[in-house]
Amino acid sequence: MGTLLCAPWQAGAGKWPTNALAHPALCFLGITTALCVIWALSVCRYDRRPRRLDREYAMTLQYQTIADCVGNTPLVRLQRMMGTTSNTILLKLEGNNPAGSVKDRPALSMITRAELRGQIVPGDTLIEATSGNTGIALAMAAAIKGYRMILIMPDNSSAERKAAMTAYGAELILVSKDEGMEGARDLADRMQAEGRGKVLDQFANGDNPEAHYTSTGPEIWQQTAGTVTHFVSSMGTTGTIMGTSRYLKEQNPDVQIVGLQPMEGASIPGIRRWPYEYLPKIYQSDRVDRIIDMGQTEAEETMRRLAREEGIFCGVSSGGSVAGALRIAREVENATLPAHGRRQERADSCR
């Protein structure tokens, strides 16, 4: 093609031939050039017009709001920390959720389902007792939906958690560290009785485990192609382990459900060893095959190892889950990583 186009010019010794229009190659070149100019002018005119998302285009967007980004988190394989074992531990990276933890799932579920049942309406004030990630997730969900959100938490909660909640527009009420989460829950109930708002109550709300039954469980089953043999999770409100275990057991009754709780006297953010009278009402002991008592030191060290050896920056509760999976590595095949650490840890805990 290059030779054809250049030949007439060379033949004319530097002069364009008088019969150029009769040459097929030159006619093609001229038509192509004209079309390119027309196209360029039309593009320039279009670019000068103000751009807007019309209704038809907006309907093709994959995510209409940030709420649509909750769930469908990746499952990755633990590598360097596995040592010589031939077993596989898989980590569910819930930190990929918009507000940074697995709690995004139940937070959005509790508000959305309450709306569908008419239990809350625009203009209502929502109240919740929280120790961290649930509060952050609820603050995000309330911001999306336009609700006023009041969160009650112990005053020894980290500054990072408080800052994240207020950044989403939530109002904080602090109780003393001696009152703890039990005191926060009692205050939430009193405020609701006084008509100051409506308590979502993550500890007794069936929409909490339902969120995991309809999303976390199916995701793990699909991502492992049904080969999961164990599910390991830390226990706080117990919503994650209750909902996920229900789904996995329906698919395969032989899947082993392993829960993590702090050992006596230990304090692990995001995991609780509840007094009997405050045990979450959504908790059903027959859904858990084994409970491991976890120490704070082991959970924190595993958290640091995940960052340094696997490149996974997570929280202490997640470190506890992985520590539990590693502890039973000779029998476990898959574990879940239920939280991401950026929004729950003090900087000095990662040193």
Predicted regions and their residues:
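Extreme N-terminal basic, low-complexity initiation segments
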Residues: 1-11, 21
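Residue-identity detector for glycine
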Residues: 2, 12-16, 30, 341
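PLP-dependent amino-acid enzyme catalytic core
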Residues: 23, 28, 32-351
